From Swiss-Prot:
The family this protein is said to belong to: Belongs to the FAM10 family.
SMART domains named among the record's database cross-references: STI1, TPR
Basic and acidic residues composition-biased segments: 49-73, 256-272
Organism: Pongo abelii (Sumatran orangutan)
Identification of the protein by name: Hsc70-interacting protein
Upper lineage: Eukaryota, Metazoa, Chordata, Craniata, Vertebrata
Length: 369
């Protein structure tokens, strides 16, 4: 199984333990049912969650949710991590040192000369002449640029000169040439320690000791390893927090999508009901309506094909009182009743709303008859 999915599941379970109300959301119903079907018991929702179920659910403020999520996340993973930085120095910014031409053709004479330069460089190093040692190792590298130990030796001098970035460049080159040599890892680990790169330092020093145990490298590994472990634990902590935050965000997105869908359904249902309310009138007005309304009005509202071409129809429908009456269920029920049987109009003689609409229609159509 994908380890990331396992971590996400672990983070979700932890979140559920901290806040069981998460399991009582509608989208988590399937999980509750499964747990109960297996004989398990879902913890009761918090009082807050129960009260929300008994009242109208308030829509979440997305901005507030985002602010809460951001508040949970520090500005950086190490913002609240305290590490002793004794011995850490500012990085060196010198131009890259000479590395020699790795494609150069090397003769035996050049190799002998390079070896002589190396011996002289080691003597200068033992005498404390560090810059002279650097220059001599550089001469040796230019003569034999494919010898890993020359880069490792020069890196050791750069570390003594407190130029960790230069040392790292030399060690990288040495490892490219011979990845099984312990010396480049040892000096690169020491360089990373000078820069406060605790995890990188621990990795390189551990590998150096694995390839060829060295007491000096082992002693420094014991110093940096606790700091590297502390950083790793801190990172895992915030990875779990990020995973929990991602789960919360996904739940929030599902919740918002469901609310949008439900709102769209409600709006569609309202439109359907509105269309049915103002739909076609059954049977038209057979035989004509009293008050000189022309007979045979085969439809109104959403299905008014018989009235579509009537002169003055737009004028009638633009009359606010007519529109208001057509939105009154009581008036429309009476209107349909009279449409089916004009004799029933007598029942509504005392209803001013119904008679007002009939009078307006009668006056309009009567005037154009």
């Amino acid at each position: 199984m994908d380890p990331r999915k396992v971590n996400e599941l672990r983070a979700f379970v932890k979140m559920c333990k901290q806040d069981p109300s998460v399991l009582h959301t509608e989208e988590m119903r399937f999980l509750r049912e499964w747990v109960e079907s297996m004989g398990g018991k879902v913890p009761p929702a918090t009082q807050k969650a129960k009260s929300e179920e008994n009242t109208k659910e308030e829509k979440p403020d997305s901005k507030k949710v985002e602010e809460d999520l951001k508040a949970d996340e520090p500005s950086s993973e190490e913002s609240d991590l305290e590490i002793d930085k004794e011995g850490v120095i500012e990085p060196d910014t010198d131009a890259p040192q000479e590395m020699g031409d790795e494609n150069a053709e090397i003769t035996e004479e050049m190799m002998d000369q390079a070896n002589d330069k190396k011996v002289a460089a080691i003597e200068a190093l033992n005498d404390g002449e560090l810059q002279k040692a650097i220059d001599l190792f550089t001469d040796a590298i230019k003569l034999n640029p494919r010898l890993a130990i020359l880069y490792a030796k020069r890196a050791s001098v750069f570390v003594k000169l407190q130029k960790p970035n230069a040392a790292i460049r030399d060690c990288d080159r040495a490892i490219e040439i011979n990845p099984d040599s312990a010396q480049p890892y040892k000096w690169r680990g020491k360089a990373h320690r000078l820069l406060g790169h605790w995890e990188e330092a621990a990795h390189d020093l551990a590998l150096a000791c694995k390839l060829d145990y060295d007491e000096d490298a082992s002693a420094m590994l014991k110093e940096v390893q606790p700091k590297a472990q502390k950083i790793a634990e801190h990172r895992r902590k915030y990875e779990r927090k990020r995973e929990e935050r991602e789960i919360k965000e996904r739940i929030e997105r599902v919740k918002k999508a469901r609310e949008e869908h439900e709102r769209a359904q409600r709006e569609e249902e309202a439109r359907r009901q509105s269309g049915a309310q103002y739909g076609s009138f059954p049977g038209g007005f057979p035989g004509g309506m009293p008050g000189n309304l022309p007979g045979g009005m085969p439809g109104m509202g959403g299905g008014m094909p018989g009235m579509a071409g009537m002169p003055g129809l737009n004028e009638i429908l633009s009359d606010p009182e007519v529109l208001a009456a057509m939105q009154d269920p009581e008036v429309m029920v009476a209107f349909q009743d009279v449409a089916q049987n004009p004799a029933n109009m007598s029942k509504y003689q005392s209803n001013p709303k119904v008679m007002n609409l009939i009078s307006k229609l009668s006056a309009k159509f009567g005037g154009q008859a």
